[in-house]
């Protein structure tokens, strides 16, 4: 039922209304050039992270320059992330009872905007961040389960290879070691080795192909962006993110009023606070902020949202809150079809490609600089 609800919201718009966007076209061109035999960073002068470039190359080999293929892949990744996160939370008993509320919230809020259907490096990297969770929260003992922390660091390294600023989530891993591990220093070193391992392999490859300098300049040593810059008007981003923000605020208030719980559950909640802070740090230091960047917050909103919808408030009130959220998502997502975008005043033009390409220049004198 959960998957059917998600597909019911997403598929009609993906199949019938596929606005072409500039970021996706850039990713397609990267994949197309790689499929033509060019080398990343040496022949293709672009700062797309290596693992994301690999995904775009595979998509080009499989489907060519197809916006539909990119949208379906993004939708599949979003669904996979929701199911993985819910399975991790249930398997490790982070709540008083097992349920599917986190996945439901993840998928509903992930349907808020068509930007979540754009296959971005952030969306790809977010999958590896979620995959790292069950490994970094291991209650390790000396001599036991050491490999799990290495794998957790390895997953965080793969996330950074999709989008370099995701390396900030090493903070989440370090705090997880502090909260859960018995030998903090040794466990931290093990996780850091796991994080560095994929980069060591990749750097060896680029040094072997005489592309090490370009790899360092275009990916590994890129300057950190310390100013907030919005790709879309900030007012539009605020309107679209109002629903997740309200849910997160109510959820945090509900989590603060919880009765005494197991030590593991308390530590996991503290870790998700660190996740939330790391997500906001990555989001607001990006060179181009849009709704798609807030995909990093979805795991935290889904986790804390469970406390809101299982709180001691009256059941009818909780049902009304969820129905209002669902209705708000549907209205925002289908606003163009139902003809209310002129009232909401949401401008998507900074993301979209022009419907009519500029006229070709013929029989004119041009200056090439």
For the regions a language model picked out, list residue spans one by one:
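Membrane-interface alpha helices of multi-pass inner-membrane proteins
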Residues: 147-164
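Extracytoplasmic catalytic/substrate-binding loops of multi-pass membrane glycan-assembly enzymes
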Residues: 15-30, 43-55
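Juxtamembrane membrane-water interface segments that cap and precede transmembrane helices
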Residues: 50-61, 216-239, 251-254
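Transmembrane-helix motifs of polytopic, lipid-linked glycan transferases
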Residues: 72-92
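Aromatic- and kink-enriched transmembrane "portal" helix at the membrane-lumen/periplasm boundary
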Residues: 67, 103-123, 135
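Membrane-interface transmembrane helices that cradle and orient dolichyl/undecaprenyl
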Residues: 130-148
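Hydrophobic/aromatic-rich transmembrane helices and adjacent perimembrane loops
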Residues: 287-320
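Transmembrane-helix signature of polytopic, membrane-embedded enzymes
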Residues: 85, 89-109, 126-127
């Amino acid at each position: 039922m959960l998957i059917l609800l998600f597909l019911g919201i997403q598929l009609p718009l993906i199949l019938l209304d596929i606005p072409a966007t500039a970021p996706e076209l850039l990713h397609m061109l990267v994949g197309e050039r790689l499929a033509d035999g060019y080398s990343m960073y040496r022949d293709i002068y672009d700062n797309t992270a290596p693992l994301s470039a690999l995904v775009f190359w595979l998509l080009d080999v499989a489907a060519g320059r197809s916006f539909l293929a990119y949208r379906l892949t993004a939708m599949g990744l979003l669904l996979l992330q929701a199911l993985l996160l819910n399975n991790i939370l249930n398997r490790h008993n982070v709540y008083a009872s097992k349920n599917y509320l986190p996945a439901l919230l993840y998928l509903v809020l992930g349907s808020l905007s068509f930007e979540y259907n754009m296959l971005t490096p952030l969306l790809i990297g977010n999958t590896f961040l979620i995959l790292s969770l069950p490994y970094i929260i291991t209650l390790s003992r000396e001599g036991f389960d050491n490999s799990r922390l290495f794998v957790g660091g390895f997953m965080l390294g793969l996330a950074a290879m999709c989008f370099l600023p995701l390396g900030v989530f090493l903070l989440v891993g370090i705090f997880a070691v502090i909260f859960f591990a018995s030998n903090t220093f040794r466990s931290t070193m093990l996780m850091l080795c796991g994080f560095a391992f994929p980069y060591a392999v990749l750097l060896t490859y680029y040094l072997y192909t005489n592309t090490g300098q370009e790899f360092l300049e275009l990916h590994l040593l890129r300057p950190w962006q310390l100013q907030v810059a919005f790709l879309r008007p900030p007012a539009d981003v605020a309107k679209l993110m109002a629903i997740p923000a309200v849910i997160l605020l109510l959820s945090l208030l509900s989590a603060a009023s919880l009765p005494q719980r197991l030590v593991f559950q308390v530590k996991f909640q503290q870790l998700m606070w660190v996740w939330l802070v790391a997500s906001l740090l990555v989001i607001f230091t990006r060179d181009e902020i849009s709704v798609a960047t807030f995909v990093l917050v979805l795991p935290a909103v889904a986790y804390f949202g469970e406390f809101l919808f299982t709180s001691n408030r009256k059941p009818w009130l909780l049902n009304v809150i969820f129905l209002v959220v669902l209705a708000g998502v549907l209205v925002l997502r289908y606003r163009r079809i139902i003809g209310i975008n002129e009232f909401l005043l949401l401008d998507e033009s900074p993301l979209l490609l022009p419907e009519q390409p500029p006229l070709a220049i013929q029989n004119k004198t041009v200056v090439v600089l």
